[in-house]
Amino acid sequence: MGTTTMGVKLDDATRERIKSAATRIDRTPHWLIKQAIFSYLEQLENSDTLPELPALLSGAANESDEAPTPAEEPHQPFLDFAEQILPQSVSRAAITAAYRRPETEAVSMLLEQARLPQPVAEQAHKLAYQLADKLRNQKNASGRAGMVQGLLQEFSLSSQEGVALMCLAEALLRIPDKATRDALIRDKISNGNWQSHIGRSPSLFVNAATWGLLFTGKLVSTHNEASLSRSLNRIIGKSGEPLIRKGVDMAMRLMGEQFVTGETIAEALANARKLEEKGFRYSYDMLGEAALTAADAQAYMVSYQQAIHAIGKASNGRGIYEGPGISIKLSALHPRYSRAQYDRVMEELYPRLKSLTLLARQYDIGINIDAEESDRLEISLDLLEKLCFEPELAGWNGIGFVIQAYQKRCPLVIDYLIDLATRSRRRLMIRLVKGAYWDSEIKRAQMDGLEGYPVYTRKVYTDVSYLACAKKLLAVPNLIYPQFATHNAHTLAAIYQLAGQNYYPGQYEFQCLHGMGEPLYEQVTGKVADGKLNRPCRIYAPVGTHETLLAYLVRRLLENGANTSFVNRIADTSLPLDELVADPVTAVEKLAQQEGQTGLPHPKIPLPRDLYGHGRDNSAGLDLANEHRLASLSSALLNSALQKWQALPMLEQPVAAGEMSPVINPAEPKDIVGYVREATPREVEQALESAVNNAPIWFATPPAERAAILHRAAVLMESQMQQLIGILVREAGKTFSNAIAEVREAVDFLHYYAGQVRDDFANETHRPLGPVVCISPWNFPLAIFTGQIAAALAAGNSVLAKPAEQTPLIAAQGIAILLEAGVPPGVVQLLPGRGETVGAQLTGDDRVRGVMFTGSTEVATLLQRNIASRLDAQGRPIPLIAETGGMNAMIVDSSALTEQVVVDVLASAFDSAGQRCSALRVLCLQDEIADHTLKMLRGAMAECRMGNPGRLTTDIGPVIDSEAKANIERHIQTMRSKGRPVFQAVRENSEDAREWQSGTFVAPTLIELDDFAELQKEVFGPVLHVVRYNRNQLPELIEQINASGYGLTLGVHTRIDETIAQVTGSAHVGNLYVNRNMVGAVVGVQPFGGEGLSGTGPKAGGPLYLYRLLANRPESALAVTLARQDAKYPVDAQLKAALTQPLNALREWAANRPELQALCTQYGELAQAGTQRLLPGPTGERNTWTLLPRERVLCIADDEQDALTQLAAVLAVGSQVLWPDDALHRQLVKALPSAVSERIQLAKAENITAQPFDAVIFHGDSDQLRALCEAVAARDGTIVSVQGFARGESNILLERLYIERSLSVNTAAAGGNASLMTIG
C-alpha cells in the first residue's frame, strides 16, 4: 500500500498538548494524529454536514499542503514500528477490545440476546425433535456415505482405533514410497483392539472393515519391520503385502471421496447435479494447505480463476442466491497473510482478491471469503472494507464473508459488517459458522501466554453465541443475506422459527458440509407438500485430489468423531433425543446454577496463566496481532529509545561512571543503544570480597523469603516487558517475537526456581556452595542470564554475574530488577567486561565455589581445566555447569507433511538468525521427498524478510557482530569452493537492502552436503545444511549424528510411531522434538540441556538443576521434589525395574555384609534412573522427562568397602563400572556374582583416564583427588563431572550419574487435537 508523508506546521504549545494527550492514553503522538485524521474523515464521510472544529490558529490558512523537504535526520529507533500502527474506527476498536474478553463477561452478555421468546422456543424444540427423530430413525444412508458414516461412528476419537484411522487417513495417500506406506499401515493397525468392534455395528461394511483390520492387525502385531515381509509371504502368499496396502488404501480413498465433491471442478459440477435437482445449491472450495511460497499462491490463484469460469458457466445466469458460488481462502492467495506483513497483504494479496471478485461479478456468482485463524480476522476485515468501496463493484451484492460464532468478537463483527453494508450501500452475504480451528486456538493462546482465549471453551457457549448472532443477522434483511451453516437440529429449528413463516426467496439460506449434512437437510430443502420445510440449503463442496484433501479430511474426522458433535451424538441411540435438541440457553443457565456463576470456562481448560496449576504462573505474553497491544508497545518503545541506557559495574557500593564505550545496534551502526564500562581488576576484587561476606547473610534468609523476592522480580520484569523488549531489539538484534519470548523465559525461570525452593528447601538441611560466578551468552542475554542467577540465588548462593561483552545493557536492567525486588546489593553483583580479563579473574579466584557457563565447548573446556585443581572447604571439586552448542539435526521421512516440515525448519534454522544453541544445523531428508521438500523450503526462504528488527515486518535480524558475520561467510565460501550447492534467498526490498550494507546481516543459507560427517563443527548463524538418506539407512544416519559427539537437540518428522521410537531410543541427545520445531524450550515443560560435547547437565528449568548448586542436602531431597511432582502426573518406572536387576544380585550376595546390604536398599529406593515423567504443558503436546543411567562410571577407591559402596551406587542407577585393574579390584570381580561382574570393566590403572567414561566417583585424600580432577579435565572431548569423597563416606549423589532426556511430541500434528476435541 503506497504511503505519502504530509507535513503540517504546529506551534510548540499544540505539539506539547498532543504529546501530553498521547502519553495519557499510552499511545504515541504519531498514532494520535493519524487517529484524529481517520476519525474526522469517517465523521465527514458519514454525514452531510462538516463537523465543526475548535477555533484553528489564524495563520493556518496560509500553511502549505505540501510536505516540507525532509532533511537528513538522525536514526530514530522504532519510528517505523510506530508508523505501522493502524488507526481504528469506534466499531473496529470495539472488536479488538473483545478479542480475549473473560468468558463470564462474554456469555452473560449473550444470554439475553440468544434467548428465544417462549412460543418460539417451544416451536423450535418441537421441530428440532422431529428433525432429529427422523434423522436417527431413517434407514441408514446407502452406498459410500453410509459406509463411511458407519466407520466414523464405530471408531470414535476417544478410542485408540479411531485415532489410528485418523492418522492413517491424514498421511497414507501422500506417501510416495511403498516401504513407508507399509510401515505406516503396520504402525497404526498392529496395536489396535479391533476385535472389540466386531459385531457392534449394524452396518455390514463396518463389520467387514473391522474383520479386515483385525486380520491385518494380527498379521503385523507380532512382527517388526525386518521380519514382516517374510511373515506375510509365509501366511498369505507372495501377493500379501500389496493386498493389505491396497485394501487399506481403498478404505482411505473411500473416506476421502465421502467428503470431496470431485477431484476437478468439472467433476464436482457434474456430481452436484443430482442434489441440485432436489433443490440444493453449492458453494465450491478448492482444497489445499495455506500457501508458503509465491509459486503456491500463484497456483491457487489460477485454480480459483479456472473454478470461477467453470462455476460461472454452469450457473448460467441463475444469480448469486439461486446459482452456485465459490469460497476462497486468503491464506492460499499469499504466503505471508498476517498482521505483521500488513503492507504486503494490501499491496499484493488485495489485487488478487479484487481480481477474483470482479471475475465472480462478471458471472454474477457469489464469492465468499472464508474465515481462518483468529489472528487473521481483523486484517481480513480491512481487505473486505477496501473491496466494498471498489467503484467497479458498486451495487453488486455477491460479496460474501464468513464469521465464526465461537469467537468472542463475533457479535461486534456483525455490528461492523452492518455498518459497512450501510456505508457501502450494498447487501453483504454473511455465512455464520461455529468455527473449525477451536483446538489450535486454545493451544496457541496457552503457548503464547495470552490473557485469555479468543474462543469459548465450552461448545454450549458457542451454540448460545450462534443464536445471538443469528438474531442480529436476521434483523437487517436489507443489508445482510444470512447463510446459516449448521448440522445441529436445534440450531436449524431455532433459526427457522426466528425467521418467521413468511419466507421469500433471497431472505436467507442454510448451509451444510458435503458428505456430512445432506441427511438432515433433505428434510428441509423441498416443498411443504412433500413434508419438507421449503428452505434452501447450500452445500459447501470441497474440490481437489486425494492428496490435497488430507488436512480437510482430518478436520472432518475430528468433528465427526468428537463425542460432543451433533453428527456423532445423533447416532448414539443411548442418548435421549430431548437432551440432544436441548436449548443451549437453558443448558447454560443450568450450568450456572450448578457452578454458582454464569459463563465459567471449561474446568479441564485452564486459562493460559494457570497452565501449570496453582503453584506457578505461566509468564504473560504479548499478542502482536492485537492492535491495542501494538499501539501500547509502540508508545513504550519510543520512550525506551529516549532513555540513556548504561551498564556500569554494580557492586555492593556504587561506583564512578568513568570512561564509557558505546554499545552499537548490530542492525544499525548509527544507533547507539547505550554505554558500558568494563569492571576494573580492583572492582572485581571488591566484588569477590562482598560476595564472600554476604554469602552467609543470604543463605540465612529463609527459603520462603528468597522465593518471595524472586517472585517479586518476576512480577517486576513482566511489568517492564515493553521496555526490556526495546533494549533486546536494539542491543541483541532480536525480532519482536523473539524479544517477547526472551522476557517470558526469564520470568519463567524466576517463578520455577522460586517455587522449588519454597516447597522443598530448608536452611538446616540444604546448604549452598557460596559465591558462584555466572557467565552468560549474548544470544539469550536476559533469559539465560536471569536463569543462571535465579537458580544460584534460589539455592542460597551469592552471585557474581559477568554478562556477554556484546549485551551488557539488558543485563544491567536484569540486575536492577533483582535489586528492586529485594536481593541485597552485595548478594548479586554485575561485572561487565571481556572473558579474557574479568571472566578469567573471576573464575581463577579460589574463593569462587561454583561456575555457571553458557557458550562455546572450547571455552567450557578451558574453564574446567582452570578450576580442576581447586577443592572447596569440604574437599569437594568446584562444580562447573556448562551448556554449550550442538550440531543439531532434524530427520524427516516421507510420511511427514511437507508444509508442516517447511514451517518448522524455517523456525528451527533461521529464527533468531540461527543464533540459538538449539537451532537446526543439518536437515536429513528421506530420498523420496527431498526434492519436493527443498523446492518448497527454498520458496519459503525467499518470502522471509531480513532487516532491522525494530520493524514488525522483520523475520530475520542481524547476526551479533562483524566477527560473527565474517566467520559465517567464511564457512559458506569454503563450502562453495568445495563444490557444494549453496542457495541463499531472502525477500528483496530496497529499504532492507540499504540496511544489509551497514548492519551485520547474513541471508538465510541452504548448503547441500554429501554426508553428515562433512560438517565438522557448529556454524552459529542462519546456515542450514542438508543431507539425503535412504530409508533403510536410518540406523547408520543416527550413528553418524551420535558420532559427532554433540547431543543438544534433535527433531524428527514422521507419522510412524516405530520410527519415532527408533530415533528417540537410539539418539544420544538431551532434547528431542517430534513433529514440531526444535527451538524455544519452555522452563519446566522441556527442561533444556545437552550431553556429550553439548554440556555437563543438569538441565536448566528442570528438577535437578538447583541440587547442583548445593554443597549439602539430605540424601532423600531429590526424591521429595520428584514425589511432589508425581502427585499430579503419573510416573513410568518400567525401565527402572530392568536396570536394577544387577543391584538386586549384589544385595543378595551381601547377605553377610549388613552395611553394604543396607546401602543397596537405600540406593535402590532413591535411584530414579529408568523413570519417565509427564510434565505440564499446553494442550496438543506431550512433554516427558526421562532419567537414564550414564553409560560408564569410573570408580576409584583404595579400600574394599568404598569400592563396594561405589559399585552399589552405580548399579542402582544401571550404569556400567570402570575399575582400575589392580589386586583389590581383581579380587572383588572374582568374588562377585556374574550378574554384577558382567557390569564391570577393568583397565590398567596408569592410563585409566584415557578410557571412555562419563562420570567419576572417587574415595581418598584431597591430593589424589586434585590430581584426578586435573587428569580428567585434561582429556579432549566431553567435560566429565568428578564426585570426590573422604574414605568411608557413602553420601554419593545419584543424580550426578543420570542423563536427562526431554521429549516433546506435537500430538496434534496429524491435523487436530483428538483429546481436546473429545472433552465435552
Curated annotation (Swiss-Prot):
Enzyme Commission numbers on file: 1.5.5.2, 1.2.1.88
Tagged with keyword ATP-binding: no
Pfam families linked: Aldedh, Pro_dh, Pro_dh-DNA_bdg, PRODH, PutA_1st
UniProt cross-references to Gene3D superfamilies, sorted A to Z: 3.20.20.220, Aldehyde Dehydrogenase, Chain A, domain 1, Aldehyde Dehydrogenase, Chain A, domain 2, Met repressor-like, Single Helix bin, Single helix bin
InterPro entries cross-referenced by the UniProt entry: Ald_DH/histidinol_DH, Ald_DH_C, Ald_DH_CS_CYS, Ald_DH_CS_GLU, Ald_DH_N, Aldehyde_DH_dom, Arc_rbn_hlx_hlx, Bifunct_PutA
Keywords assigned by UniProt, alphabetized: DNA-binding, FAD, Flavoprotein, Multifunctional enzyme, NAD, Oxidoreductase, Proline metabolism, Repressor, Transcription, Transcription regulation
GO biological process: negative regulation of DNA-templated transcription; proline biosynthetic process; proline catabolic process to glutamate; response to oxidative stress
Stretch list, region Aldehyde dehydrogenase: 653-1119
PROSITE patterns: ALDEHYDE_DEHYDR_CYS, ALDEHYDE_DEHYDR_GLU
One Gene Ontology CC term in the entry: plasma membrane
Active site, per annotation: 883, 917
Renumbered residue ranges of the record's region Proline dehydrogenase: 228-574
Annotated pathway: Amino-acid degradation; L-proline degradation into L-glutamate; L-glutamate from L-proline: step 1/2; Amino-acid degradation; L-proline degradation into L-glutamate; L-glutamate from L-proline: step 2/2
Molecular functions (GO terms): 1-pyrroline-5-carboxylate dehydrogenase activity; cis-regulatory region sequence-specific DNA binding; DNA binding; DNA-binding transcription repressor activity; flavin adenine dinucleotide binding; identical protein binding; proline dehydrogenase activity; protein homodimerization activity
Reaction catalysis annotation: L-proline + a quinone = (S)-1-pyrroline-5-carboxylate + a quinol + H(+); L-glutamate 5-semialdehyde + NAD(+) + H2O = L-glutamate + NADH + 2 H(+)
Protein family according to the UniProt entry: In the N-terminal section; belongs to the proline dehydrogenase family.
Biological function: Oxidizes proline to glutamate for use as a carbon and nitrogen source and also function as a transcriptional repressor of the put operon.
Subunit: Homodimer.
Classification via NCBIfam families: D1pyr5carbox3, PRK11809.1, PRK11904.1
Identification of the protein by name: Bifunctional protein PutA
Species, as recorded: Escherichia coli (strain K12)
